[in-house]
Amino acid sequence: MYNLKDMTLEEMEEFFVNIGESRYRAKQIYKWIYGKKVTDFDQMTDISKNLRSKLKEIAYVSQLKIEERRVSEIDDTVKYLFLLEDGNIIEGVAIKYRFGNTACVSTQVGCNMRCSFCASAIGGKVRDLKASEMVDQVMAIDSDYGKISNIVLMGSGEPFDNYDEVMKFIKIVNNPHGLGIGSRHITISTCGIVPKIYQFADEKLQVNLSISLHAPNDELRTQLMPINKAYPLEELMKACKYYVDKTRRRITFEYSLIEGVNDKKEHAYQLVDLLKGMLCHINLIPINYVREIGFKKANNEKVMMFKRIIEDAGISCTVRRELGSDIEAACGQLRRKYLKER
């Protein structure tokens, strides 16, 4: 059975041609699936009964089941656990900003990158998600929380470790006949898979790129993020400069401040030296506490010191506001707790 949500518009056009139907049927079906949120072929009333019968025999339109939903009493952030068709569990988050609602989407069940501060990495990667499973997260959040205007691929998993399905997902949600979410309202976050950064730059998309950096030197970054052994900072910075030169777009560098680990004054100056001259923005993140890992977030005084050093060097910098801290909003936390209790 074909899941129609796994198809870009072009792929769906080919699908209809291959089953002896007109190419324009794809736009009709896209309108029903993404415009009207219909999954039952019998409700697609401008499609002939014969075609509806044919589709029921060979295709379906997926939906995600919300297994659990937790609402923050602090800031209206909502954390979702979704049940996949094969019984696996993934997480999604809905976040309210002044500019609209953002869906934080997972790209894998678990993660292989083994970053030492991330709950998603505990237990490793189970499998990649299909494009449809990413699309379904956005649509489920949209239906439950309110219209989604922005997407961040910052949930569980490494997007560039599932590159092809992530690119397909972007095409589907970006298509005006699909969800119609603008490229500049979509952000991909990567821990730094260098060959994929070059490939992504060559796609010439207007999608935002965010790099999970978290350390200003190789020794510390390798301790925190094993990916740095394969792609050390010199290689990563070359790839980032290539991306900026190719796309003329700014990169955001994510830097989680961990008490006593990467929050010293010397680290701030090293970060400035690493990034000075690049078209970039630094997003400082007071790290979410994860019980199994034990890291604590840097205190506010150190966060502000770090920010001041960066801004004094002429680099754009913000501190990400804490969201959903009362509902275990750190990536991987809620899923891990659910699996333990099940």
UniProtKB/Swiss-Prot annotation:
Its cofactor is [4Fe-4S] cluster. Transmembrane segments: none annotated. It is found in: Cytoplasm. GO terms for molecular function: 4 iron, 4 sulfur cluster binding; metal ion binding; rRNA (adenine(2503)-C2-)-methyltransferase activity; rRNA binding; tRNA (adenine(37)-C2)-methyltransferase activity; tRNA binding. The active site is at E91, C331. Residues 97-326 form the Radical SAM core domain. [4Fe-4S] cluster binds at C111, C115, C118. It catalyses: adenosine(2503) in 23S rRNA + 2 reduced [2Fe-2S]-[ferredoxin] + 2 S-adenosyl-L-methionine = 2-methyladenosine(2503) in 23S rRNA + 5'-deoxyadenosine + L-methionine + 2 oxidized [2Fe-2S]-[ferredoxin] + S-adenosyl-L-homocysteine; adenosine(37) in tRNA + 2 reduced [2Fe-2S]-[ferredoxin] + 2 S-adenosyl-L-methionine = 2-methyladenosine(37) in tRNA + 5'-deoxyadenosine + L-methionine + 2 oxidized [2Fe-2S]-[ferredoxin] + S-adenosyl-L-homocysteine. Keywords: 4Fe-4S, Cytoplasm, Disulfide bond, Iron, Iron-sulfur, Metal-binding, Methyltransferase, rRNA processing, S-adenosyl-L-methionine, Transferase, tRNA processing. GO terms for biological process: rRNA base methylation; tRNA methylation. Its EC number is 2.1.1.192. Reaction proceeds by a ping-pong mechanism involving intermediate methylation of a conserved cysteine residue. Specifically methylates position 2 of adenine 2503 in 23S rRNA and position 2 of adenine 37 in tRNAs. This is Probable dual-specificity RNA methyltransferase RlmN. It comes from Thermoanaerobacter pseudethanolicus (strain ATCC 33223 / 39E) (Clostridium thermohydrosulfuricum). The lineage of its organism: Bacteria, Bacillati, Bacillota, Clostridia, Thermoanaerobacterales.
